[in-house]
């Protein structure tokens, strides 16, 4: 989201500072599918949540590469969807359960017709049947942190992107960070969202000063110094996070 403005800001800062990109050492990098490019669309939330689901399956040894264009096509059938096509990771989960999902190679452009069937390992499925094997109902939980609502209770985020009025479990920020860290260290898929952008968290790194960062899988192609990855400091996680989606059982794990 807001990609053009972001790129202009990055270009201006780089032109003024002329500084090389910051160096990061990877402490943990989870498996992921190839970096994709959302183009000029504001559908980063689709790419981020699908990337989290893909990483989750890769951690099981199951290779899944999903089509963001299929979900973008299904938005045409959603009367509540804003013209911007913005949404949240929780929105993506709802849409998968409603419309299903197909593999990336089955639909590589939003301008192509949506496939009626998915062919996998010699078997034929509807998109809805395939979706049930990719993302079980209630498999993921949506989390947030706001001091304006009671902690450990569910709340509806009052933001335009939450046009399906999904509910989020409200946690103290330190707890949200700890749960996110646990999920990443256990190789689970995690979708992270600010008010402006969404990415998948795929690992942990540190800079030359030893400061910790999350490794982020972006959806802006492989141009740039980090070849499609980005880095989010733990401090920025605390100040910028709007929501996180991750496997439900991670929240209730004992350690």
Q: What feature does the model see in each segment?
A:
Residues 47, 51-60, 95-102, 182-183, ...:
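Structured segments of extracytoplasmic/periplasmic soluble domains
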Residues 43-46, 70-73, 92-95, 103-106, ...:
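Structural recognition of the beta-strand scaffold that forms the well-ordered cores
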Residues 38-53, 82-91, 197:
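Active-site nucleophilic cysteine motif
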Residues 13-15:
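C-terminal motif of bacterial Sec signal peptides marking the signal peptidase cleavage site
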Residues 17-19:
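Bacterial signal peptide processing site
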């Amino acid at each position: 989201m807001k990609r053009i403005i972001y790129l202009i800001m990055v270009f201006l800062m780089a032109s003024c500072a002329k500084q090389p990109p910051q160096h990061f050492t990877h402490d943990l990098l989870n498996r992921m599918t190839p970096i994709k490019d959302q183009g000029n669309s504001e559908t980063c939330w689709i790419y981020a949540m699908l990337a989290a689901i893909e990483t989750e399956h890769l951690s099981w040894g199951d290779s899944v590469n999903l089509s963001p264009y299929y979900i973008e096509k299904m938005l045409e059938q959603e009367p509540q969807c804003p013209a911007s096509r913005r949404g949240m990771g929780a929105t993506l989960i709802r849409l998968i359960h409603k419309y299903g999902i197909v593999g990336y190679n089955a639909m590589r452009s939003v301008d192509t017709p949506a496939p009626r069937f998915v062919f996998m390992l010699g078997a034929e499925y509807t998109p809805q049947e395939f979706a049930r094997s990719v993302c079980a109902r209630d498999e993921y939980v949506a989390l947030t942190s706001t001091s304006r609502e009671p902690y450990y209770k569910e709340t509806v985020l009052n933001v335009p992107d939450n046009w399906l009025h999904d509910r989020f479990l409200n946690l103290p920020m330190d707890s949200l960070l700890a749960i996110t860290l646990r999920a990443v260290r256990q190789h689970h898929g995690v979708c992270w969202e600010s008010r402006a952008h969404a990415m998948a968290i795929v690992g942990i790194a540190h800079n030359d000063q030893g400061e910790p960062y999350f490794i982020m899988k972006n959806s802006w192609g492989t141009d740039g110094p980090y070849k499609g990855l980005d880095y989010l400091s733990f401090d920025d996680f605390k100040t910028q996070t709007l929501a996180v989606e991750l496997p439900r059982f991670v929240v209730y794990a004992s350690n």
